[in-house]
Amino acid sequence: MMSTPSIIKSVANPYYVTNSKYFVNSEGSEILQNFTDVIIEMIATAHESGLTQSVNITEGGRGGLELIQNKSQESAKEIANKASELINAKPVKEEKTTLVMNPDFVSLLTHEILGHPSEADRVLGKEMAWAGGAWWKGKIGEKIGSENLNVFDDPTIKESLGWYYFDDEGVETKKTNLIENGILKNHMQNRETSEIFNSVPTGNMRATNYRYMPLIRMACTCIANGNQNVDEIIKDVKNGYYISNMKVPSIDMKRYNWSISCQYAQKIENGELTDLQRDVIVMGNAPEFFNSIDACGNDFTVRPITYCGKGDPMQSMIMGNGGPTIRGTATVKSVN
Protein backbone atom coordinates (compact mmCIF):
# COMPACT_ATOMS: atom_id res chain seq x y z
CA MET A 1 0.00 0.00 0.00
CA MET A 2 2.83 2.41 0.82
CA SER A 3 4.08 2.38 -2.79
CA THR A 4 0.88 4.09 -3.96
CA PRO A 5 1.20 7.88 -4.55
CA SER A 6 0.20 10.14 -1.61
CA ILE A 7 -0.15 7.23 0.86
CA ILE A 8 1.45 8.26 4.17
CA LYS A 9 0.22 5.43 6.39
CA SER A 10 -1.05 1.89 5.94
CA VAL A 11 -2.19 -0.66 8.49
CA ALA A 12 -3.01 -4.35 8.12
CA ASN A 13 -4.26 -6.09 11.25
CA PRO A 14 -4.89 -9.83 10.87
CA TYR A 15 -6.25 -11.80 13.81
CA TYR A 16 -8.28 -14.85 14.69
CA VAL A 17 -10.90 -15.61 17.34
CA THR A 18 -11.68 -19.09 18.65
CA ASN A 19 -15.10 -19.82 20.09
CA SER A 20 -16.17 -22.93 21.96
CA LYS A 21 -19.70 -23.34 23.34
CA TYR A 22 -20.97 -26.25 25.39
CA PHE A 23 -24.74 -26.31 25.95
CA VAL A 24 -26.79 -28.61 28.19
CA ASN A 25 -30.47 -28.27 29.11
CA SER A 26 -33.23 -30.13 30.96
CA GLU A 27 -34.70 -31.37 27.66
CA GLY A 28 -31.72 -33.67 27.19
CA SER A 29 -29.74 -31.52 24.77
CA GLU A 30 -25.95 -31.71 24.92
CA ILE A 31 -24.28 -29.61 22.23
CA LEU A 32 -20.63 -28.69 21.66
CA GLN A 33 -19.74 -26.18 18.94
CA ASN A 34 -16.22 -25.02 18.03
CA PHE A 35 -15.50 -22.26 15.52
CA THR A 36 -12.52 -20.19 14.43
CA ASP A 37 -12.95 -16.76 12.87
CA VAL A 38 -10.17 -15.25 10.76
CA ILE A 39 -10.26 -11.52 10.09
CA ILE A 40 -8.02 -8.86 8.59
CA GLU A 41 -8.67 -5.14 8.95
CA MET A 42 -6.83 -2.80 6.59
CA ILE A 43 -6.66 0.97 6.25
CA ALA A 44 -4.80 3.25 3.83
CA THR A 45 -4.36 6.98 4.52
CA ALA A 46 -3.38 9.53 1.88
CA HIS A 47 -2.32 13.14 2.46
CA GLU A 48 -1.51 15.90 0.01
CA SER A 49 -1.94 19.68 -0.12
CA GLY A 50 -3.49 19.83 3.35
CA LEU A 51 -6.16 17.18 2.63
CA THR A 52 -6.24 13.76 4.29
CA GLN A 53 -8.37 10.84 3.09
CA SER A 54 -8.59 7.31 4.50
CA VAL A 55 -10.20 4.18 3.10
CA ASN A 56 -10.57 0.95 5.08
CA ILE A 57 -11.91 -2.53 4.52
CA THR A 58 -12.40 -5.69 6.55
CA GLU A 59 -12.21 -9.20 5.13
CA GLY A 60 -12.82 -12.47 6.91
CA GLY A 61 -15.10 -15.32 7.80
CA ARG A 62 -15.54 -18.47 9.86
CA GLY A 63 -12.97 -21.00 8.72
CA GLY A 64 -9.29 -21.07 7.78
CA LEU A 65 -6.66 -18.57 6.66
CA GLU A 66 -7.63 -19.08 3.03
CA LEU A 67 -10.65 -16.84 3.69
CA ILE A 68 -8.38 -13.80 4.00
CA GLN A 69 -5.34 -14.89 1.97
CA ASN A 70 -7.38 -14.93 -1.23
CA LYS A 71 -8.71 -11.40 -0.73
CA SER A 72 -6.27 -9.36 1.34
CA GLN A 73 -3.75 -8.38 -1.34
CA GLU A 74 -6.40 -7.36 -3.85
CA SER A 75 -8.32 -5.41 -1.20
CA ALA A 76 -5.15 -3.67 0.01
CA LYS A 77 -4.37 -2.42 -3.49
CA GLU A 78 -7.96 -1.26 -3.96
CA ILE A 79 -8.14 0.83 -0.78
CA ALA A 80 -4.70 2.37 -1.36
CA ASN A 81 -5.65 3.41 -4.89
CA LYS A 82 -8.97 4.85 -3.73
CA ALA A 83 -7.44 6.81 -0.86
CA SER A 84 -4.91 8.29 -3.28
CA GLU A 85 -7.62 9.16 -5.83
CA LEU A 86 -9.82 10.79 -3.18
CA ILE A 87 -7.21 13.51 -2.68
CA ASN A 88 -8.38 14.97 -6.00
CA ALA A 89 -12.08 14.20 -5.52
CA LYS A 90 -14.71 16.82 -4.74
CA PRO A 91 -17.38 16.91 -2.01
CA VAL A 92 -20.82 15.90 -3.18
CA LYS A 93 -23.62 18.40 -3.82
CA GLU A 94 -26.63 17.85 -1.53
CA GLU A 95 -29.60 16.43 -3.42
CA LYS A 96 -32.26 13.75 -3.30
CA THR A 97 -31.55 11.45 -6.22
CA THR A 98 -31.18 7.92 -7.56
CA LEU A 99 -28.52 5.89 -5.77
CA VAL A 100 -26.90 2.60 -6.73
CA MET A 101 -25.39 1.01 -3.60
CA ASN A 102 -22.72 -1.68 -3.69
CA PRO A 103 -22.95 -4.85 -1.52
CA ASP A 104 -20.54 -3.61 1.16
CA PHE A 105 -22.61 -0.48 1.79
CA VAL A 106 -25.82 -2.52 1.59
CA SER A 107 -24.54 -4.85 4.32
CA LEU A 108 -24.40 -2.04 6.90
CA LEU A 109 -27.74 -0.61 5.74
CA THR A 110 -29.25 -4.08 6.14
CA HIS A 111 -27.67 -4.51 9.57
CA GLU A 112 -28.92 -1.23 11.00
CA ILE A 113 -32.32 -0.67 9.36
CA LEU A 114 -33.54 -4.21 8.57
CA GLY A 115 -31.66 -6.52 10.93
CA HIS A 116 -31.95 -4.93 14.36
CA PRO A 117 -35.65 -3.99 13.94
CA SER A 118 -36.28 -7.67 13.05
CA GLU A 119 -35.21 -8.85 16.51
CA ALA A 120 -38.50 -9.63 18.27
CA ASP A 121 -37.38 -8.43 21.70
CA ARG A 122 -36.87 -4.98 20.19
CA VAL A 123 -40.21 -5.08 18.40
CA LEU A 124 -41.85 -5.80 21.77
CA GLY A 125 -39.96 -3.01 23.52
CA LYS A 126 -38.13 -5.43 25.82
CA GLU A 127 -34.62 -4.46 24.71
CA MET A 128 -34.47 -0.71 24.11
CA ALA A 129 -30.79 0.10 24.71
CA TRP A 130 -28.68 1.30 21.78
CA ALA A 131 -31.50 2.54 19.50
CA GLY A 132 -33.63 -0.45 20.42
CA GLY A 133 -36.95 0.42 18.77
CA ALA A 134 -38.43 -1.03 15.59
CA TRP A 135 -39.95 1.17 12.90
CA TRP A 136 -42.32 -1.59 11.74
CA LYS A 137 -43.79 -2.57 15.12
CA GLY A 138 -47.22 -4.14 14.63
CA LYS A 139 -46.86 -4.31 10.84
CA ILE A 140 -46.49 -8.07 10.17
CA GLY A 141 -48.46 -8.83 7.02
CA GLU A 142 -48.20 -5.23 5.79
CA LYS A 143 -46.25 -3.77 2.88
CA ILE A 144 -43.10 -2.03 4.14
CA GLY A 145 -41.04 -1.99 0.93
CA SER A 146 -41.18 -2.52 -2.80
CA GLU A 147 -41.85 -5.94 -4.31
CA ASN A 148 -38.11 -6.10 -5.10
CA LEU A 149 -37.27 -6.24 -1.39
CA ASN A 150 -36.70 -9.73 0.06
CA VAL A 151 -34.86 -10.11 3.36
CA PHE A 152 -33.80 -13.18 5.34
CA ASP A 153 -31.61 -14.24 8.24
CA ASP A 154 -29.61 -17.43 7.75
CA PRO A 155 -27.13 -18.84 10.30
CA THR A 156 -26.47 -21.79 7.96
CA ILE A 157 -24.45 -19.77 5.40
CA LYS A 158 -21.10 -21.51 5.63
CA GLU A 159 -17.93 -19.46 6.18
CA SER A 160 -19.89 -16.33 7.13
CA LEU A 161 -19.23 -14.84 10.57
CA GLY A 162 -22.85 -15.64 11.42
CA TRP A 163 -22.56 -19.38 10.78
CA TYR A 164 -23.48 -21.77 13.63
CA TYR A 165 -25.63 -24.87 14.16
CA PHE A 166 -27.55 -24.29 17.41
CA ASP A 167 -28.34 -21.14 19.35
CA ASP A 168 -28.01 -20.62 23.11
CA GLU A 169 -31.50 -22.03 23.76
CA GLY A 170 -30.55 -25.26 22.00
CA VAL A 171 -32.64 -24.42 18.93
CA GLU A 172 -31.30 -25.73 15.62
CA THR A 173 -30.62 -22.97 13.10
CA LYS A 174 -32.40 -22.47 9.79
CA LYS A 175 -33.10 -19.77 7.24
CA THR A 176 -35.87 -17.37 8.29
CA ASN A 177 -37.64 -15.23 5.71
CA LEU A 178 -38.32 -11.81 7.23
CA ILE A 179 -39.63 -9.84 4.23
CA GLU A 180 -41.08 -11.35 1.05
CA ASN A 181 -41.76 -9.12 -1.96
CA GLY A 182 -41.97 -6.09 0.30
CA ILE A 183 -44.34 -7.72 2.85
CA LEU A 184 -43.16 -8.06 6.46
CA LYS A 185 -43.54 -11.77 7.29
CA ASN A 186 -41.69 -12.56 10.50
CA HIS A 187 -39.15 -11.49 13.10
CA MET A 188 -36.18 -13.28 14.61
CA GLN A 189 -37.68 -15.16 17.57
CA ASN A 190 -36.68 -16.91 20.77
CA ARG A 191 -38.78 -19.46 22.66
CA GLU A 192 -40.67 -16.75 24.56
CA THR A 193 -41.38 -14.29 21.74
CA SER A 194 -42.39 -17.03 19.31
CA GLU A 195 -45.38 -17.77 21.55
CA ILE A 196 -46.39 -14.10 21.51
CA PHE A 197 -46.15 -13.87 17.71
CA ASN A 198 -47.65 -17.33 17.09
CA SER A 199 -44.41 -18.28 15.34
CA VAL A 200 -41.53 -20.68 16.05
CA PRO A 201 -38.07 -20.11 17.55
CA THR A 202 -35.68 -19.13 14.75
CA GLY A 203 -32.34 -20.04 16.34
CA ASN A 204 -31.16 -16.47 16.99
CA MET A 205 -30.72 -16.50 20.78
CA ARG A 206 -27.04 -15.81 21.53
CA ALA A 207 -24.84 -14.50 24.34
CA THR A 208 -21.33 -13.09 24.04
CA ASN A 209 -20.17 -15.64 26.62
CA TYR A 210 -21.33 -17.58 29.68
CA ARG A 211 -21.43 -14.46 31.89
CA TYR A 212 -24.32 -12.88 29.97
CA MET A 213 -27.96 -13.69 29.33
CA PRO A 214 -28.66 -14.62 25.69
CA LEU A 215 -30.35 -11.99 23.51
CA ILE A 216 -32.03 -12.27 20.13
CA ARG A 217 -29.20 -11.51 17.72
CA MET A 218 -28.79 -11.38 13.98
CA ALA A 219 -26.72 -14.19 12.53
CA CYS A 220 -26.46 -13.38 8.83
CA THR A 221 -29.24 -10.97 7.85
CA CYS A 222 -29.24 -10.11 4.15
CA ILE A 223 -31.20 -8.64 1.29
CA ALA A 224 -31.77 -11.50 -1.14
CA ASN A 225 -30.07 -11.74 -4.52
CA GLY A 226 -31.77 -10.24 -7.56
CA ASN A 227 -31.50 -11.06 -11.25
CA GLN A 228 -30.11 -7.89 -12.80
CA ASN A 229 -26.60 -7.25 -14.04
CA VAL A 230 -24.92 -4.43 -12.12
CA ASP A 231 -23.82 -2.67 -15.31
CA GLU A 232 -27.44 -2.64 -16.46
CA ILE A 233 -28.58 -1.19 -13.13
CA ILE A 234 -26.11 1.69 -13.55
CA LYS A 235 -26.84 2.11 -17.26
CA ASP A 236 -30.51 2.89 -16.54
CA VAL A 237 -29.62 5.88 -14.31
CA LYS A 238 -29.69 9.28 -15.99
CA ASN A 239 -28.51 11.22 -12.95
CA GLY A 240 -27.38 9.79 -9.61
CA TYR A 241 -24.51 8.30 -7.63
CA TYR A 242 -22.81 4.95 -7.15
CA ILE A 243 -22.29 4.49 -3.39
CA SER A 244 -19.35 2.32 -2.32
CA ASN A 245 -18.47 0.69 0.98
CA MET A 246 -19.74 1.25 4.50
CA LYS A 247 -18.38 3.75 6.96
CA VAL A 248 -20.35 5.11 9.96
CA PRO A 249 -24.11 4.86 10.72
CA SER A 250 -26.38 7.22 12.64
CA ILE A 251 -29.98 6.21 13.40
CA ASP A 252 -32.93 7.32 15.51
CA MET A 253 -34.44 5.25 18.33
CA LYS A 254 -36.81 3.34 16.03
CA ARG A 255 -34.32 3.12 13.14
CA TYR A 256 -36.83 5.01 11.00
CA ASN A 257 -34.60 7.94 10.04
CA TRP A 258 -31.04 7.02 9.16
CA SER A 259 -27.81 8.33 7.74
CA ILE A 260 -24.80 6.25 6.76
CA SER A 261 -21.52 7.62 5.44
CA CYS A 262 -19.70 5.78 2.68
CA GLN A 263 -16.02 5.42 1.86
CA TYR A 264 -16.46 7.05 -1.55
CA ALA A 265 -18.98 7.59 -4.33
CA GLN A 266 -19.03 8.18 -8.07
CA LYS A 267 -21.33 10.41 -10.05
CA ILE A 268 -23.58 8.64 -12.58
CA GLU A 269 -24.39 10.66 -15.69
CA ASN A 270 -26.43 9.20 -18.54
CA GLY A 271 -25.63 5.66 -17.40
CA GLU A 272 -21.88 6.23 -17.07
CA LEU A 273 -19.69 6.43 -13.96
CA THR A 274 -17.87 9.76 -13.95
CA ASP A 275 -16.39 11.93 -11.15
CA LEU A 276 -15.19 10.45 -7.86
CA GLN A 277 -16.82 12.05 -4.79
CA ARG A 278 -15.47 12.21 -1.23
CA ASP A 279 -16.93 12.75 2.26
CA VAL A 280 -20.39 11.48 1.32
CA ILE A 281 -23.32 10.80 3.66
CA VAL A 282 -26.48 9.00 2.51
CA MET A 283 -29.71 9.92 4.34
CA GLY A 284 -33.26 8.60 4.20
CA ASN A 285 -36.23 7.28 6.10
CA ALA A 286 -36.88 3.57 6.14
CA PRO A 287 -40.29 3.10 4.47
CA GLU A 288 -39.69 5.72 1.78
CA PHE A 289 -36.31 4.31 0.83
CA PHE A 290 -37.27 0.62 0.86
CA ASN A 291 -40.39 1.35 -1.20
CA SER A 292 -38.18 3.13 -3.74
CA ILE A 293 -35.99 0.08 -4.48
CA ASP A 294 -36.54 -0.75 -8.15
CA ALA A 295 -33.55 -3.00 -8.88
CA CYS A 296 -31.51 -5.71 -7.14
CA GLY A 297 -28.33 -7.06 -8.69
CA ASN A 298 -27.17 -10.65 -9.11
CA ASP A 299 -23.92 -10.04 -7.18
CA PHE A 300 -25.02 -11.19 -3.69
CA THR A 301 -22.18 -10.92 -1.17
CA VAL A 302 -21.92 -11.53 2.58
CA ARG A 303 -19.66 -9.07 4.40
CA PRO A 304 -18.08 -9.41 7.86
CA ILE A 305 -19.45 -7.29 10.71
CA THR A 306 -16.83 -7.60 13.44
CA TYR A 307 -18.48 -5.53 16.17
CA CYS A 308 -22.16 -5.18 17.03
CA GLY A 309 -23.33 -3.99 20.42
CA LYS A 310 -26.67 -4.78 22.04
CA GLY A 311 -28.08 -4.93 25.54
CA ASP A 312 -27.41 -3.24 28.86
CA PRO A 313 -24.90 -4.29 30.05
CA MET A 314 -23.75 -4.19 26.44
CA GLN A 315 -22.77 -7.41 24.69
CA SER A 316 -20.58 -7.39 21.59
CA MET A 317 -21.03 -9.91 18.79
CA ILE A 318 -19.60 -10.65 15.36
CA MET A 319 -21.88 -11.62 12.49
CA GLY A 320 -22.43 -11.49 8.76
CA ASN A 321 -24.62 -9.13 6.77
CA GLY A 322 -25.00 -8.71 3.05
CA GLY A 323 -26.96 -8.43 -0.12
CA PRO A 324 -26.54 -7.49 -3.76
CA THR A 325 -26.18 -4.12 -5.43
CA ILE A 326 -29.48 -2.25 -5.05
CA ARG A 327 -30.98 0.90 -6.57
CA GLY A 328 -33.27 3.33 -4.78
CA THR A 329 -33.83 6.99 -3.92
CA ALA A 330 -32.29 8.87 -0.99
CA THR A 331 -30.44 12.09 -0.17
CA VAL A 332 -26.69 12.59 -0.44
CA LYS A 333 -24.71 15.39 1.15
CA SER A 334 -21.12 16.18 2.08
CA VAL A 335 -19.70 15.71 5.56
CA ASN A 336 -17.92 19.06 5.23
Language-model features: where?
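N-terminal small-residue-enriched
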Residues: 1-336
